[in-house]
């Protein structure tokens, strides 16, 4: 009936067709529509009347104005939802055609309205239905995020109303982690309305929890209008965050089964082309304006052939021509359903080889039943790539819970195979587990887990005795010159030794197996092996557990402690037990059984260390993976080598390398250790021959066997002494077995064990404390010596009065000194000097220069306050000095420095001349100590600034004095010769009169003996070098 009324209301043709435009606020729609009307021939000469809308419902008022005041023939615009539905109802009442750019469904608009926005939930549901039919999916699941809840529910309701064979097994909200069990056990084909973040989480859950994750197909419906490449790039980057490459590869394999379903109209390419063509800025507002242009273009295609715009009001004829037909618009293809709702176009993409591949188009088809409501067969799914065939089917042969497949026959076959292969499988499992343990390398220590002891450093520097470096170390090496250090590994203190690594180290399987065995060795008398750090820098670091009392060599020969029979028996038994455990293990031999490798913990338990590792290091050195240790010098052979078995000493002298240890060699060295514990003597200490001569005597087969001398009058039984001497036989096979040594030790000390374990511990502690008085006295003497060195160093850094106050514990209060003299020495062109030399040479040159300055200052009544870079500050008159003697002292020092610089040569470049500028000023300063942990003596005042100005404004090789200082010098000490320089501009002071100090009359009379002075200066330089070396050694 409405269409009949519209047919009756055909107005008389007028020359100007009026279009009423409800313009969105600040959208510039009018200009864009005028451009579109000019491009359309039938609209070019007609009037466009634009009134604002979408602001406090002014669009409703202006719609009425357009109808009643302007009598427009066509209404367009009103993009806001709150106005467009009401305008649609008004247009129906006025019998006007209304082109709306708002997203309206069939239920939300009237029959005279055409909804032009290509975003329709019903259309999206139609697209999903068409896709499922094309891919023969009969069961699906729908998952969505909280942000897409409205969209997902609307589409689900539309799909659920269809009388179709498409079944929705699951419809759940998830963040990628929750509700996943139900989802994974309900469907294999999933339609995703998740956010990109939730989708990435869901993929990780799918990878970890799904029984067969590669059976899942996921079609992700883009609700965020994101770029296609950005979507897949985000997923790929998310896979890159996996903890290992295998997990990342599994996740990327799952991404091959995800397809992105995207509205084609979300692509802004056509909008950008239009903006570029007409000089506009691409924006979403421009896109909405182009949607209105699509409506005008649609009507133009209908009216242009007829040449009469009034036929726009003939809606039945208009509807038949503009619906169910595809035309090209400004924003893309336009397809209006039979109810006046524009249907969207979709495209599908998949990810292959790092790029998005277009696999299908989904477009509307001509049908009398297609529109804004959910119908059937309104879309056709057009595949464009065979990649769609890679998506798995919608169901699994075994069902969603794997309940359709019977595993009975599988279990039967597995039981039979397991029964047949039980023993080989067990063996293979054992070997595999063993191999896995070897490849796991539990003995490897990461470099970042090692924290070196700041107070430890090189242990050789912590004692005065030269042998302490090996005695205090938890282990030693025969040929390595390295010194053990302390470090912290996993909150445990360890002893470490570094070896220079030349290139990447690759341990053989046999070596890794031995290191594993070392790592897992556990015995009371075996020091635990912490591990090795390698291929993480330029060093290989070997670590053993640290013991608090260091080694037996340290206790017996360095600390010179005397132990009774209880301690002796305990030490010997512990060593015997430890070596017995090593000989019965897969390591077999120790190879370096010295007292320095018998370390003692806080409970007086002896532990053997430094075994099983030297052969591996030697092999790595032969492969040039480690730098070789310092060459073995036969002429400077160490005393401890005399404790090796004769056959091993011969190998050392011949090959100059350490031989592999043997069980018989360990027996020989065990006897040497027992000898030293019993008699507190080093082997062959009574001999007069040199160590080299003793080594040749021991290795010689022609001479009589050479054994350590057993002291006479000892209290030990002949049984024990005899077994010790049998261990020293030259023939390895003739040496006694370890069990005989154990028996002799037990017989010797078995009667000494009396009382309970606590009684024995108390007795041992009493014996240990008996020698403490002598140790305390010795340590007191060492402390006094160290304090004397500290005092001398303190007097060099601070004035004597200040140093005495600090030593006595008094607080040093800042003081004001009314009359002192300062000398500032400035190295000329220091920047160019630094550019011409490498940093090491700069430091060496300045060290040599300033040491010479220090030597000159110390011979006068002055002291160096500080030197920073190229500045050197000297002060005289603190704390007190009668009269102006401090001025005379400073002048003498400056003249000596001037004379010294004439002969100073830069050692690394003798042709380079180094010059200094000096400035002298007398006056008042404030002096005091700054800092507590690292105190420094500092002076402040205008006198310091003036002295610096005198130095900076002077000439190279000259000594400049301020006017007041020069007048005082001429008055008090006329022997000094001054020359007036004149007025100069001094920063912060203005124009000042200054003088040059040119010499002293007494010194000038002695210039004839120039050569003798030069010799004296060279002597002083040598003394300065010696002082510097002594200072560094201290």
Swiss-Prot record:
The keyword Hydrolase does not apply. Gene3D superfamilies: 3.40.50.2300, Nucleotide cyclase, Transferase(Phosphotransferase) domain 1. CDD domains: CHD (cd07302), PBP1_NPR_GC-like (cd06352). The gene is gcy-25. The protein kinase domain is predicted to be catalytically inactive. Residues 1-16 form the signal peptide. Expressed in AQR, PQR and URX sensory neurons. Residues 464-749 form the Protein kinase domain. Its main location: membrane. It comes from the Eukaryota. Glycans are attached at residues 28, 224, 301, 308, 373. The keyword Repressor does not apply. InterPro entries: A/G_cyclase, ANF_lig-bd_rcpt, Cyclic_nucleotide_synthase, Kinase-like_dom_sf, Nucleotide_cyclase, Peripla_BP_I, Prot_kinase_dom, Ser-Thr/Tyr_kinase_cat_dom. It is an enzyme of class 4 (lyase). This is Receptor-type guanylate cyclase gcy-25. Guanylate cyclase involved in the production of the second messenger cGMP. Disulfide bonds: none annotated. Residues 431-1034 are cytoplasmic. Its EC number is 4.6.1.2. Residues 17-409 are extracellular. SMART domains: CYCc, S_TKc. It is a single-pass type I membrane protein. It is found in: Cell membrane. The chain crosses the membrane at residues 410-430. Keywords: ATP-binding, Cell membrane, cGMP biosynthesis, Coiled coil, Glycoprotein, GTP-binding, Lyase, Membrane, Nucleotide-binding, Receptor, Signal, Transmembrane, Transmembrane helix. It holds the Pfam family ANF_receptor.
